[in-house]
């Protein structure tokens, strides 16, 4: 018999006693939107219809700790017995020598308690298979759960990314680049329940279609973690060329990033988003020193999330490979910062010097306001 449903287990939601029902409701909505299917909930479990494609998609939904394809049957011993035998047969091979029965019941009126179920179905397996019991390190775990309406039998458990459901912790406007760090940082925020909206600065014709294509490919990946990801593309060419006119060229990147933050600050506040986020990693490049971060982030009073601040690069790469963003980030394409960077960028910029140079750019704030309005007019 084929599997009828997929049983879904919550992540940290079981610890959130006070707001548990709200978190579960948000998770249920997220699963429905990403899978485009009906979600049933029962006690501390959720169920969706079984489809092979769902097994991959459920691995990336924040708030889910694990899930299992399950056989569903009536809550009668003879029915459960048949499913246990079939599921065991399906999951044993020449290397399977030991087993363990794991029983659980939310229906306390069922005729056997959990210990009695373990003994009953353990005896059944011993009679029908050449297997031995091993409760510490079995080759095969046979799970039996008795719910309010049905019983469920399964052997396989797939693990998801855990965390909290997206939208349970607010929103952030994320400064997205085509590099390795920024996409990983965004997904780490999603895992903590943040709904992430994206702001990406492009500079045509200096950045080509490959750059935009990379961003759209990243959007497809983000949609595995959160439904309906929005990426706002900002044509920054005019301002980038304008900043190139300053007298101290070493400050070009610092002034550009200060400008990014002013634009992000205004957009976030107009959209009632309470935080700005990025993929900054301390000391990795000139714009990611403490002095640079102070100089740049002074342009907003919003909370700034830097989830990768103290990470090792190899750990970021490993996670990017797991999330399928690394393969996209490493596609060759032109990046604004690379094209714009001076030979020797300042690594310890000061706010006073940056403000002095910005006085040379009389129209920069006007140009930034134009970009803000263009983004807000996007659907």
From Swiss-Prot:
Gene3D superfamilies according to UniProt: 3.30.2130.30, HUPs (3.40.50.620)
Q: Where in the cell is it found?
A: Cytoplasm
Superkingdom is Bacteria
Cellular component GO terms, alphabetically? cytosol
**Pathway noted in the entry:** Cofactor biosynthesis; thiamine diphosphate biosynthesis
What are the recorded GO MF terms, alphabetically?
A: ATP binding; CCA tRNA nucleotidyltransferase activity; tRNA binding; tRNA-uracil-4 sulfurtransferase activity
Keyword Metal-binding assigned to the entry: answer is: no
- What is the reaction catalyzed? [ThiI sulfur-carrier protein]-S-sulfanyl-L-cysteine + a uridine in tRNA + 2 reduced [2Fe-2S]-[ferredoxin] + ATP + H(+) = [ThiI sulfur-carrier protein]-L-cysteine + a 4-thiouridine in tRNA + 2 oxidized [2Fe-2S]-[ferredoxin] + AMP + diphosphate; [ThiS sulfur-carrier protein]-C-terminal Gly-Gly-AMP + S-sulfanyl-L-cysteinyl-[cysteine desulfurase] + AH2 = [ThiS sulfur-carrier protein]-C-terminal-Gly-aminoethanethioate + L-cysteinyl-[cysteine desulfurase] + A + AMP + 2 H(+)
THUMP domain location: 52-157
Listed binding positions for ATP are 175-176, 257, 279, 288
Q: Which family does it belong to?
A: Belongs to the ThiI family.
Instruction: Tell me what this protein is called.
Output: Probable tRNA sulfurtransferase
The scientific name of the source species is: Mycoplasmopsis pulmonis (strain UAB CTIP) (Mycoplasma pulmonis)
